[in-house]
C-alpha cells in the first residue's frame, strides 16, 4: 500500500466541525514543558514576537487544561501545501483514500492519520526546547522509525526539517519527491514551487486512487509530469516545462 508522509503547517483555519479534546500519551512530556514556559520564554523558543507568544501561550494552556477544541488535522492546517490539497467536496472514495493513505508528521502529536483530531498549535522541530535532555527530534526518533514498515511503500512529501527526525536507514526505505520548474531553459526549485506541487501531487494521487509506484509515474498536475531521466528508484522528479 502507498503511504504518504506530509508535514504540518504554521497557518491554520478553524472553519470546520469541532471535536472533543484528545491527546496522545506520548505527547504529555512535551506539553508539560510548554505549559511551564512564560510568554517571554515562548517568544525565545519559537523565535516569534511577544504578541504571537501570548496567543500561543493561551493555546498551550487550553491544551494543558483539556479545553482546547480539536479539528481534523488535514482541515485545520492551512499552509500553502494544504491550500493546494483538495480537502472539501471529496467523494466518499477520495475521502477514504486520504484517511487511509495520508499521515502527518507532527512535533507535538507524532505521526498521525490525516484526519486525526488536533488542537491549534505552532510547535515544530525548529522550536528550541528540551524534553529532559532530548531535542524534539531525538524525543520522537524511535516512534518515527517504528512507523516505517518494510512491507509498505512510503512517499515522502516532507521538508528536510521533518525527514531528519527519521534515522538514515528509515529514510532509505521511502521514495522522496522533487518538483522543478523550467525557466529560460534551466530547471529551478524553491520553497513556493515545492509546497504548491506537494499539495497538487497529493490531490492527483487521491483523485487517481494510486495503488502502485507505476501509478505515480503517470500523474499530471498543475503542469508537472514525471521525469524518467532525472528520477531514480528512490527519488521521483516531476518537471513543469516552459509553455
Swiss-Prot record:
InterPro entries: YaaA
One of the Pfam families matching this protein, by short name: H2O2_YaaD
Biological process, per Gene Ontology: response to hydroperoxide
A cellular-component GO term for this protein: cytosol
Domain of life, source organism: Bacteria
Assigned protein family: Belongs to the UPF0246 family.
PANTHER family: PEROXIDE STRESS RESISTANCE PROTEIN YAAA, PEROXIDE STRESS RESPONSE PROTEIN YAAA
Annotated protein name in UniProt: UPF0246 protein SUB1767
Organism: Streptococcus uberis (strain ATCC BAA-854 / 0140J)
